Every structure is written in C-alpha cells, then in structure tokens.
C-alpha cells in the first residue's frame, strides 16, 4: 500500500519546478504519480495542469491578497497558495477540505510555521472573491497567457487571436487513431459503442475519432492489441499530405515519440521506414509504440542538421519533418509551454528549423515529397519559414498546401477540432 502523501504540496513543488527551473511537466509528473494511489493520480494531474493553465490569474490574485511575495526558501508556499486558490475556483472539492489539505501541505514542505498565513490568505480570498474576480476580468491577466505570446498572436491573427487564446485555455479533447490494418473506423466505433462509450469521426482525417468523454487507454477496445492509438487529429493530418506508399523508403525525422512513425506503417505496411530523433531517451518511446503495434522500423539517434552522420548518402522517396518548434499550437494539452517558452526562443527555433530543412533536402529523391510540419501557430516557424526556403531552394516546389506568397496550411486549435498545426508539402523537381 502506498504511503499517504499530501497531494497539494506535491503539486506546488511540481509547478515550482516548471516555473522557476524550466522543467517540463511531462518529465516531472509521471515519477510523482508513481508515489500515490491510483485514485490520487488523476487529482494530482488535475492540480498541476489546472494551476499551470490558470497561473496568470492565480499570480494576480496572490499579488492582491498579499503585501509582498514569498521569496527564497519560502517560494514553494507561493505555489501552495496557488494550489489552494485553484481548488476554490475550479474544482468541486468542498472548500473546507481544500483549505484543510492545502494548509496541511505546509508541514509536507517543512514550513509548518506558515500554516496560519496560508489559511489567512485563502480565507481572505473567500471573503473578497466576488470583487477580486470582477477586477481580474478587466485586467490583461484574464487571457491567461504571457504578454510576449499574446502580442505575437495578436499580430499574426488580428481577427482570430481571442478564439486561439480561448481554445488554449480549455481542456483538450481526446483524439484517437484507429489502426486501419485491424479495423475500419466504423467497425471500431461500433466496438466503442458496445463498451458504453461514444466517439465522433473527423470529417477530413480518415482514421481520427474524438471521444465524447476522455477515458483511460486500458478502457479502449483493443488498445493493448494495437487497434487504436492516442493521437491528436491534427497530428494525423500529416499522413494526408505525406501519402506514403508500400515499398517506398520513408524518413520520419524528429520522430519521437513515434506516433507518426506508426501511422506511416498503418497506411503503408510495406514501406521501409527510418525513424530518427536527437533525443535518445525519447527514442525508447518509439520502440515501445512499434512493439505495441507489432511493427518494424529502423530507429536511429541523430541530429537532423547532420544527416550524413546517420544515413550517409542515402536518399528517400518521402520525408516527414516534424520540426522542433515552440509548440504554441498544443498549449491546451501542455499548459506548461506558456511558462517554459520565452520570446527569444522563437528566432532560435526558426534558425534551427531552417538548418534542418537545408540539411535534409539533398536526401530527398528527385520527384520525392517532403512534408514540413510543426505544432506551432506562429508564422516565423511556419509560412515565413517555408516562404524563405522556397526562395533559396531552386528545385523545391510547393504542392497542394497554400500559395508561394502564403505557403502551407495552418490549423488553429478548436474545441471539437485538433490542435494548432502547420503543414507544407514540398516536391523536389
């Protein structure tokens, strides 16, 4: 039996590691969840994700409720108060229980002398909640995005930025990819219905299903047997443009965790696929995904800027480059992105993308297809990146996705749609 732990203090420390130390929640959370009971795993995740989603609001409230911020060794208390405020604002946890557990969290972080302070701040919020929220709703913090990102979205999407921000602040839908080598989408939807769950097919992507209500993967018909994979609809859209064929040599570059690698093999089971990623640790997930689905691919660790180091002079019929990016299209799925990214990262990422594109292009056969994809919504990484590439690359031609003046297809995040995603299909003349 797992030792009873204070979830509020665990959430506070996790959020602190994200915001203060720049660590990714997807690295921090799984080891923490191993320490708690199954029923507490979901609540711990809810507290971490929720606080990061609404961090601007919680920070704003603390600045109103406290004369001066907590600093130094007491900084964790700042995040513990955030966890308390989040529960009072956004969960169904009874207020007395939320307060009691949050105050007890002070003992777990070895700050028992601050229990009274935490209790006082949270009770003050309860008394002043109405007027504080009215004031908050007229502040810039209400958009729940850092100011640098808000400015970029407003500049890029003067008519749509508010709907993008709104989508980013929602909980994400759960999208699945039906493995067409096992079932048609309709036959798997019938199995889902028999299991007491409801799913909706995507209008454009033939394998994509949105669950009416997110569910644990072990509850999905045939998940362990590889009948279905969790993958956002927009990520599945890459196959529409790549159109892999049996017998072809295909490179999936920046492949981890392997969702697109396995999708290529579902669409073209007899393709020869090479999956490459710079991160050796994340490549283990590519192996895991291939194993669960019973598929084979050549998996290599390598830097996309130096392809000759891992493929020599080899050329490919098709290349999928899912480029490293700001991930500004998947904020609703990874709210820590808002606080991990900085404005200065964008030109650095654009430079990296440009270097990878230039390096990998010679490894595409004449007449071959390269699909450039990102989960970003920022033009510097997307349409402007491809426009510049087309201008400097004489044998590259845009195909089916946009115009040379406005190249690529940009998906924006939507409540019943996929994440923010960009695609450009390029043909080598």
UniProtKB/Swiss-Prot annotation:
Pfam families on file: Methyltr_RsmB-F (PF01189), NusB (PF01029), RsmF-B_ferredox (PF22458)
UniProt GO molecular function: RNA binding; rRNA (cytosine-C5-)-methyltransferase activity
Signal peptide: none
SUPFAM superfamilies: NusB-like, S-adenosyl-L-methionine-dependent methyltransferases
Catalytic activity entry: cytidine(967) in 16S rRNA + S-adenosyl-L-methionine = 5-methylcytidine(967) in 16S rRNA + S-adenosyl-L-homocysteine + H(+)
InterPro entries linked to this entry: MeTrfase_RsmB-F_NOP2_cat, MeTrfase_RsmB-F_NOP2_dom, NusB-like_sf, NusB_RsmB_TIM44, RCMT, rRNA_ssu_MeTfrase_B, rRNA_ssu_MeTfrase_B_ent, RsmB-like_ferredoxin
E.C. number: 2.1.1.176
GO cellular component: cytosol
GO BP terms: regulation of DNA-templated transcription; rRNA base methylation
Record PROSITE patterns: NOL1_NOP2_SUN, SAM_MT_RSMB_NOP
Residues binding S-adenosyl-L-methionine, per UniProt: 254-260, 277, 303, 322
Compartments reported by the entry: Cytoplasm
Active site residues of this protein: 375 (nucleophile)
Keyword entries, A-Z: Cytoplasm, Methyltransferase, RNA-binding, rRNA processing, S-adenosyl-L-methionine, Transferase
Family: Belongs to the class I-like SAM-binding methyltransferase superfamily. RsmB/NOP family.
Function: Specifically methylates the cytosine at position 967 (m5C967) of 16S rRNA.
Protein name: Ribosomal RNA small subunit methyltransferase B
Organism: Shigella sonnei (strain Ss046)
